[in-house]
Amino acid sequence: MEIPKFLFITVIAIGLSGSLTWANPLANPEAEATAEAGPEAEAVAEAVGEAEPLLPLIPILASLIAAIKSG
């Protein structure tokens, strides 16, 4: 199965943009406010932080599934 060039470029671009967003130190500008809000807010912020790296995988997987079905 041959992967179209645009699909390959799209997957790389989405992956890079996601990793750049995670590495940005300004990604969580309200870190001090979260710490002051209490343990519940810290638990929610931690859960969101753990789930965030999975979000860019959704369009990548969708595009790969579409490529497999069309090919």
Curated annotation (Swiss-Prot):
Q: Show the propeptide residue ranges.
A: 24-53
Molecular function (GO) terms for this protein are:
sodium channel regulator activity; toxin activity
Task: Name positions with the PTM Serine amide.
Answer: S70
**CC per GO annotation:** extracellular region
Nucleus among keywords? no
Which cysteines pair up through disulfides? They are: none
What tissues has this protein been observed in?
Expressed by the venom gland.
Its function, per the record, reads: Toxin that causes a rapid paralysis when intrathoracically injected into insects (blowflies). Does not cause spontaneous nocifensive behaviors by intraplantar injection in mice.
Family per similarity comment = Belongs to the formicidae venom clade 1 family.
Task: Recite the other comments.
Answer: Negative results: does not exhibit hemolytic and cytotoxic activities on HEK293 cells.
What is the protein named?
Myrmicitoxin(1)-Pm4a
